[in-house]
Structure formats: C-alpha cells, structure tokens
Amino acid sequence: MRVDLFDFDLPPERIALRPVEPRDASRLLVVRPDSGDMTDHGMRELPDFLRAGDVLVVNDTRVIPARLHGFRSRGESRAKIEATLHKREGEALWRAFVKPAKKLRVGETICFARQEPGTEVESLEAEVLEKGAEGEVVLGFNRAGAALDAALDLLGEMPLPPYIAGKRAPDSQDSLDYQTLFANRSGAVAAPTASLHFTPRLIAAIEARGVTICKVTLHVGAGTFLPVKAEDTDAHRMHAEWGEVSAEVAAFLNKVHAAGGRIIAAGTTSLRLLESAVDEDGLIQPFQGETSIFMTPGFRFRAVDILLTNFHLPRSTLFMLVCAFAGLETMRRAYAHAIAASYRFYSYGDACLLFRATRNTSTGAAL
C-alpha cells in the first residue's frame, strides 16, 4: 500500500509533553468499526467496556535509562559523545546510536560519567566493537548483567521520544512518568505507553469486573520511532524486538478464548507479541525470541479482540497497525475527530479503545 495513505496533519499543540495527573485522568476515545460508533470517555470508564471472563494483556518490560553522555579521548584531546542504547546483544553488549559518529573508530573507548556538584561518580566505559551505518555501533561495556543495569540507572537518562526530547530536556520526573506500573523486566528503550494510563485504582476496578490481567514481555526498541522512508509498505523493513509469552500465559489465553472471553491487548507491543505467537488455528503458542511482525490493512488478526492504545504518528508503522486492526477509513475518521476534539497525542497523550473490525474497512477518504 502507498505510505501516503497513512499521512495526516497534526497541529504541534496536540503533542503532549507531560502526562496528565493522575494517570487515569486521561481521555479515552472508544471506536467500534463495525457499527461506526465513536464515543468520548475518560480512562476511568475503561472497565465499563470489559466483561467478566475477559483478559487484559499488559507488557511488563521496564524502560532503562538508555541515553548516556560521555567522551572519547585521543591523545590529549577529548570529544563529547552521546549514545542511545537500543538493543541488548549480550550481558555486556549493546547496539547503540551515537553522535557524532563520523570520527569515532572501532577499538576506541568511550567513558560515561555524570558530574555532580563537587564530585564525579564512578564512570562506566565501553569499547566500540563494531561500527555500522547511520551512527549505529556495538558497544562492549566494562560491566555486565545486573552491574551494568545498575550503572545505567545511575548514569543514564530516560530516552524520551524525539517529538518530546526535541522540545524539552528529560528530567527526574520522567524517570517516574515514563515507566508503567507493570514494569519489571529491564530491557526496553521506549515505554509501552498504553499502560502508562493505569493506576492502582483503575487496576482494582478492572479486576472487580471479573477481568484477569496477564503479563507478557516485549522489550520495545528505538526502532518504534523510526519513520517509514519507503513510499510503499512492501518496501519497508521492520525492526526486530525480543519478546516472551510463557507457556502458562499462552495456555490461559487459549482457555479464555475457548470459553468465549475476549483478549484485550494493552498497547501495540502486547498485540504484536501475541500475533507473533498465535498459530494458523488461532491458538497462542509459547514464544521466546525476536519478532519483526509488520501489520498493514489486510493483515488477519487471530489473537487479539480489542486494543487499548495511544494516538500515533502519521506515516508510522503503529498508525498502520491500528488501521489494519480497525480499518483505514475508521481510523482516519477517528484521528480527525481526536484532533478536532483536542485529544492529546503520542507517548504522554490520551488513549483509544479499538474493537477489531470484522469486515473490510480498508479504504477511505482523506483526513
């Protein structure tokens, strides 16, 4: 399909730079493609659209402070380096985007440290093991596993998306705001943002409806923010991300479907993982590994019935995903409504609850 079909104009003031407080005070647009219904609600009303026997699947990945500031030394000269980790390759290995990258050489060491008033914390070092295109390198750190994670927590910054970081610097509040209540397994460099709306109060209300909450893991990579540069979706190559669906969770989800319950994915990351794990017969299998699944209109969804998600960028793979799930025409209308009604967009913005389209809704007029 032509990528320009997924383009739309978004006023800059619709981009949320901070989340609402409390988290469940965000707005919720409910979209039912088959009936054409589109209604405005609040996030606290989410339980009203769920029923006993349903299951809500959340992503328990934890965002690491993946943006590091340091320097490389060459003789007596020093050059500042910024590195954004985006994919773990081993206990002490990470792929990263660095800048400036042009003069950085394989074999050089980058020293990362945070300067505190009157002191300098213990530094972290990484050797450049490989150098690729567009500023990508492989870094080998002098710490591994939990010790490396602890150093990143101390020295790193939250890797805010470019549409936020381009307008303000990350701060200590982002360390709280850009982490979900379900965060447990470290490895993501972007938050599964649909779950940022949950509070203990909202979780309790959902469980009181007889809805079970299940956890899966997908370590969200920086590729989630990469623009689609191709003119046709067939020419786009999707980034890979590591995920896991345990045998216990897979068996439970299949049991829910067999009993007539619905699977609600909290976020596109949960949906992408479940649709990577499902077989041709609609049974979800245990899964552990990388997925580069790419969904555009015409994709056949087998696992997920309802999707909770934020509002996404134009021409992005995530907007293509929601168009595949609920229909292109439906989502173009929904986004036009959201813009006109002053919904807040992107990671810190509002949410929409999408019921899966069961008929062909893949064509539509301009937004």
Curated annotation (Swiss-Prot):
Pfam families: Queuosine_synth (PF02547). GO terms for cellular component: cytoplasm. Its EC number is 2.4.99.17. Transmembrane segments: none annotated. It catalyses: 7-aminomethyl-7-carbaguanosine(34) in tRNA + S-adenosyl-L-methionine = epoxyqueuosine(34) in tRNA + adenine + L-methionine + 2 H(+). Pathway: tRNA modification; tRNA-queuosine biosynthesis. It is found in: Cytoplasm. GO terms for molecular function: S-adenosylmethionine:tRNA ribosyltransferase-isomerase activity. Its main location: cytoplasm. One of its GO terms (biological process) is tRNA wobble guanine modification. Keywords: Cytoplasm, Queuosine biosynthesis, S-adenosyl-L-methionine, Transferase. Belongs to the QueA family. NCBIfam families: PRK00147.1 (NF001140), queA (TIGR00113). Transfers and isomerizes the ribose moiety from AdoMet to the 7-aminomethyl group of 7-deazaguanine (preQ1-tRNA) to give epoxyqueuosine (oQ-tRNA). Monomer. This is S-adenosylmethionine:tRNA ribosyltransferase-isomerase. It comes from Beijerinckia indica subsp. indica (strain ATCC 9039 / DSM 1715 / NCIMB 8712).
